[in-house]
Amino acid sequence: MSETHCLELFSTAPQSSATKDDDYMAQVAEVARWSEESGCRGILVYSDNSLVDPWLVSQIIVENTAALCPLVAVQPVYMHPYGVAKMVSSFGYLHGRRLYLNMVAGGFRNDLLELNDQTPHDKRYDRLVEYTLIIKQLLASSLPVTYVGEFYKIDKLRMAPRLRPDLLPGIFLSGSSQAGLQAAQKLAATAIQYPKPAGDLPPARDAGIRIGIIARSGEGEAWQVADQRFPEDHKGELMHKLAMSVSDSVWHKQLSQSAEEARSRRSIYWLRPFETYKTFCPYLVGSYRQVAEELSRYADLGYGTVILDIPPSREELQHIRRVVDLVTERVSA
């Protein structure tokens, strides 16, 4: 299936923490193939203290697809910027595959504390800007790079092997906080949000959303699937509240506030999966046309990149593809 002209679609790879060891490689390969078949540009690969290294997962993805681009979550606390640039250039040299980088300022607060990183929230974005600038300069320049900043210093550092210009990585960055939005602007990066309903969002430029989709021919059928996949779960709600209590993430708090506001009305925008600690993004639930209309509203506001939740099956991605095709038809009309 061809890509849409108004939406750039990414899926998400399974997490190793939720999969049996002997099944994980096969599951990553399978989800990657489904994603490519469904017209996705790339696939997000998570990174935190509990997960398999994202670069090794990206290797599995590249080996099992023809053009799907890994969107690798990158945290400064894990690797020097030279190491990230070297990984990107090596993937380009060995596979001729473009990567995308999802620049993460901190992730889970407890992960940072375990690594003795006590950098304040907004300061982590200052660090992330320096970190990303060094990566971009190393990959784009044919000359040695010197950089002196508050957090990093390099002196006449050259990247080899050289990366082809057409393989320079796309840069994504969480844009839910003011610090995140400012960092994205400085880096000319795509600001990704865990969004509120489209009607509650301001216009944006070169932005994206992280969202799940459950769509069927009829609204009732979609909600039946949604309730079966994400039933009420008191234990999950307690885990969510515990995670909230130790998080300094702005998007986490914003989504929790949206959940309080959404309880009083049933709408296409659904947060039970988030509230029961099953996922970290909101969902759109409804008929193909209802979900397409809401996605179109996001796209009209400038949120043209969509990062989907982990797909449970090939069939589910095919349902989502029908939604995206309706959005495309609307743009082409």
Regions found by a protein language model. Give the residues of each.
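N-terminal beta1-alpha1-beta2 module of alpha/beta enzyme domains
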Residues: 1-67, 168-169
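Acidic (Asp/Glu)-rich catalytic clusters
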Residues: 2, 33-37, 58-67, 88, ...
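An alpha-helical appendage that flanks or caps ligand/catalytic pockets
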Residues: 2-3, 115-116, 121-163, 198-297
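Hydrophobic faces of well-ordered beta-strands that scaffold small-molecule active sites
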Residues: 3-12, 43-45, 69-74, 99-103, ...
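Active-site mouth loops of central-metabolism enzymes
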Residues: 6-26, 73-77, 81, 167-176, ...
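Catalytic domains of carbohydrate-active enzymes, especially glycoside hydrolases
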Residues: 27-47, 183-193, 297-304
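Acidic-and-aromatic substrate-binding clefts and catalytic sites of carbohydrate-active enzymes
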Residues: 43-54, 77-82, 193-200, 215-217, ...
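Alpha-helix-loop-beta-strand connector modules within alpha/beta enzyme cores
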Residues: 54-72, 127, 131, 321-333
